[in-house]
């Protein structure tokens, strides 16, 4: 990757660091803040096709619970949101006008996601989890195990029931196969809400 590409991406992330108050970790190309065992990260990705004429960037927002393992691993992520540029995956920051436009977009997005959620957890941990359950469950792909751990099964049960109701007959058959030892689907091997439902006898 050329020096221009690296410098442009570094400038983009550093400006977002200033706008959000998140720490810029250059080695990970990420923004990070921590409250106790909760780690908030915005991870940036760049296209392998980037060159001086086209610089594409994208980002994911992740919330990790260090009680479950190191941050940003399959074991510890409890909520996440990917940013999508309509039909295109990459956001183009190749020239000044595009750079400024996409910077403004991400400043707005991160204020309503990463900054807002950090502030909520900083103010009231349990209330922030309740907010994830009630307002942002689908948008942030929130994990059941975390919500049950913090809020209790009774509080989270309506979301679990909603999840089960939306399963297709094929999904239910795969859960039955998993209980008999099948390991041919990604969710059977990794932590997921389907895995949680199957392992805890909800179906």
Predicted regions and their residues:
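Amphipathic alpha-helical segments
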Residues: 2-25
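Intrinsically disordered, low-complexity regulatory regions enriched in serine/threonine/proline
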Residues: 1-6, 32-203
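Long, charged, glycine-rich C-terminal linkers/tails
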Residues: 25-31
